[in-house]
């Protein structure tokens, strides 16, 4: 009965070094704004209705014509959104958020051309800002590493063991933690909250952290549903990055007394 004593090992080898990949690539859509027919004010109206008010591109075009008398195609609205996302993404990704030492991570699914894709989110559980995100066609460890790298990059000095990273029970997170220790010598505490009920002391203590990012997922999904899915991988990434810009800098939050999470002087003095 030798088969009873056979040992099985799972061996993982990464063919891509996710720690050398560029976190902040420049999109081909990142160009200057030149308006042939419309102007920056109309573009601002497009983004306000489309992103802030959760309207689809067709609904946005319809409202602009019915309310403002501006005849614009839904394709132009989509192009404005893609260009704005490409231009503002570097600012959002490299802003100094001054994060706390409790991060929360989760993933949710979206559709790209009818095929399931995944959005990875890492947020500051205390200050509520989104620090890292990725869009991928798989639920593998690679995109998880990239999202975590983007979040850790916000620290001027990595806190090490003082950092508590809270996630669900998915296996990608401990594998990513292992790679950070091997490749960058970054050690941090990973806490996995498993299940929907508090069956153990860990879940009871850190359930609130997990619920913060789950509420964020629901907030994003309410804006995502009107899109009926994205048309390309790049469109999905830049569509989500535009929503992150709105969430971090424009959306009123009860946590901050119904003011945006990160207030900018340039926005405070700007008119509508």
Residue ranges of each PLM-predicted region?
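Basic, short loop/linker segments at the boundary and entry of helix-turn-helix/winged-helix-like folds
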Residues: 1-51, 70-73, 98
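Two-metal-ion RNase H-like nuclease active-site motif
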Residues: 98-112, 121-123
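Short, basic alpha-helical nucleic acid-contact segments in DNA-binding proteins
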Residues: 71, 79-98
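Acidic/histidine-rich, metal-coordinating catalytic segments
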Residues: 159-174, 194-196
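Active-site beta-loop-alpha junctions of metal-dependent nucleic acid enzymes
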Residues: 82-83, 133-158
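Active-site proximal helix-loop segment of RNase H-like, two-metal nucleases, encompassing DDE(D)
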Residues: 202-205, 209-232
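DNA-recognition alpha helix
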Residues: 57-70
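C-terminal domain-tail junction helix/linker
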Residues: 226-230, 237-272
């Amino acid at each position: 009965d030798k088969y009873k004593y056979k040992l099985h090992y799972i061996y993982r080898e990464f063919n891509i070094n996710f720690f050398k990949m560029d976190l902040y690539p420049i999109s081909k859509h990142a160009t200057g704004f030149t308006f042939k027919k419309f102007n920056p004010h109309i573009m601002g109206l497009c983004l306000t209705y489309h992103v802030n008010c959760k309207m689809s591109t067709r609904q946005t075009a319809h409202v602009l014509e019915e309310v403002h008398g501006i005849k614009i195609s839904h394709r132009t609205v989509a192009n404005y959104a893609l260009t704005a996302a490409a231009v503002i993404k570097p600012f959002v990704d490299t802003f100094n958020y001054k994060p706390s030492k409790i991060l929360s991570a989760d993933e949710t699914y979206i559709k790209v051309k009818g095929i399931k894709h995944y959005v990875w989110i890492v947020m500051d559980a205390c200050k509520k800002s989104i620090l890292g995100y990725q869009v991928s066609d798989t639920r593998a460890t690679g995109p998880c590493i990239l999202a975590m790298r983007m979040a850790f990059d916000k620290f001027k000095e990595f806190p090490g063991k003082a950092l508590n990273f809270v996630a669900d029970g998915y296996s990608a997170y401990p594998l990513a933690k292992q790679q950070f220790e091997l490749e960058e010598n970054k050690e941090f505490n990973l806490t996995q909250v498993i299940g929907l009920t508090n069956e153990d002391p860990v879940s009871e203590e850190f359930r609130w952290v997990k619920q913060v990012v789950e509420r964020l997922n629901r907030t994003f999904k309410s804006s995502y549903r009107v899109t009926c899915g994205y048309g390309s991988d790049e469109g999905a990434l830049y569509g989500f990055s535009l929503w992150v810009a709105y969430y971090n800098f424009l959306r009123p939050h009860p946590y901050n007394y119904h003011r945006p999470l990160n207030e900018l002087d340039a926005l405070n003095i700007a008119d509508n």
